[in-house]
A protein has these predicted regions:
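Transmembrane alpha-helix detector for multi-pass membrane proteins
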Residues: 2-73, 94, 98-101, 239
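Hydrophobic alpha-helical transmembrane segments
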Residues: 8-10, 78-90
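N-terminal start-of-domain structural block
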Residues: 64-65, 89-92, 377-379
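Short basic (Lys/Arg) and small-residue
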Residues: 77-83, 99-182, 186-187, 195-380
Length: 380
């Protein structure tokens, strides 16, 4: 009897200590991530990790189960099955705690964080841009003259950032009312109260404004569910923080450029023409504002070049990424990349007065510095 109570008490104490350590470490990780990487990685990566959530849930369940089992036991009664189950959960908590220490140490490394953001970005790109690029440039409905809208639906309630739009429901409503609905902001935009949310063209009286507003999700911070540009934003912010004078870690910036290069290779082969959403009959029903190829290229290279051109490592890695993209992407994607290559040449000429540094900065290197300038098949 005494031994069972002592065992349950030890399990409760151990799981309480595990919980304190876990949440304390999470707070430290949040501070480190916000200070050395970017605050935007906290909500998208750290607080959404299912492994940390599951292990924390195991600790809480084990603590409550062991404490409740101790409360059920009378003075001369031992609930052997419950004590055995509590002991199993206690052992599982110990194993999970040891695993969590190793997992957290690997998870908080820069390469792991940027790789996870890259994986999330790939998933969002594949879900938003599902069709391959055709190479045919077509003027979207968004840029065609439609005249003044027949009705403007404005934002009501609280202001916020557009997180997602239920496009399927919008198309269904537009088809039933025989109208064209233009969603004015872009996913990721901040919308203030009384700011235009929808433009309606056609039989606008058949649509309820309040039901239309419920098809848009708002929040206080951007997410990646329907916003592939946000993955680029996070990676660029990590690179910029690494290039700041306070941190001065261009190698971490190179890791971020690796993932930007990877995302651009994927998005460059996709059709970005998703402004017009058609119904089953082929008629345009919903018009959205979406990023084009130039937007993705600009966010990937402009700021990093601006703040990192003085680093030979960054200049070489940017050049390697751009030249590789020109080689592997379709012809209609090359013009924006050639402009960035020209801007890199101008920037390094301004930042590197010595001919030797200038010549070195003009050599593409996928490692930044340390990679071979020319691949050879025979090395002696």
């Amino acid at each position: 009897m005494t031994g069972a109570r002592s065992l349950l008490g030890d399990i409760v104490s151990a799981d309480l200590a595990f919980l304190v350590f876990t949440f304390g470490s999470l707070l430290v990780a949040i501070q480190v991530a916000g200070g050395q990487y970017t605050p935007r990685i906290i909500a998208t990566t750290l607080l959404r990790d299912n492994v940390i959530r599951s292990i924390s849930g195991l600790f809480v369940f084990t603590l409550l189960f062991a404490n409740r089992t101790a409360g059920w036991m009378g003075e001369n009664q031992v609930l052997q099955m419950q004590v055995f189950i509590a002991a199993l959960f206690g052992f599982a908590s110990l194993v999970a705690f040891l695993f969590l220490i190793d997992y957290a140490a690997k998870f908080l490394r820069p390469v792991s964080l940027v790789a996870r953001v890259g994986e999330q970005g790939i998933a969002v790109i594949e879900s938003v841009y599902r069709l391959p690029s055709t190479g045919v440039v077509v003027a979207p409905e968004l840029h065609k003259e439609r005249g003044a809208p027949d009705r403007i639906v404005c934002q009501r309630g609280k202001p916020g950032i557009v997180l997602a739009v239920n496009v399927e429901r919008l198309v269904a409503k537009a088809r039933r009312a025989d109208v064209v609905i233009q969603f004015v902001p872009q996913v990721g935009d901040f919308v203030a109260v009384d700011e235009p949310l929808f433009h309606l063209y056609g039989n606008f009286g058949a649509i309820d404004e309040n039901k239309l507003r419920t098809l848009v999700a708002f929040g206080t911070e951007r997410t990646m569910e329907q916003d592939p540009m946000f993955a680029f934003r996070i990676l660029v912010d990590i690179a910029l923080k690494a290039l700041s004078a306070a941190i001065n870690d261009p190698t971490t910036a190179v890791l971020a450029i690796d993932q930007l290069h990877r995302l651009l290779r994927v998005v460059g082969k996709r059709s970005l023409r998703v402004e017009e959403i058609e119904d089953r009959s082929g008629r345009v029903r919903v018009i959205l504002r979406t990023p084009n190829w130039e937007n993705f290229v600009h966010i990937s290279f402009r700021e990093i070049r601006q703040y990192g051109a003085s680093s030979i490592q960054i200049a070489r890695r940017l050049r390697a990424a751009i030249e590789n993209l020109i080689q592997c992407l379709p012809e209609h994607r090359h013009e924006a990349l050639r402009v960035e290559l020209m801007l890199i040449d101008r920037a390094i000429e301004r930042h590197h007065p010595f001919p030797e540094d200038l010549a070195l900065a003009r050599i593409p290197d996928s490692q930044g510095l340390g990679g071979s300038a020319v691949s050879t098949t025979n090395n002696y």
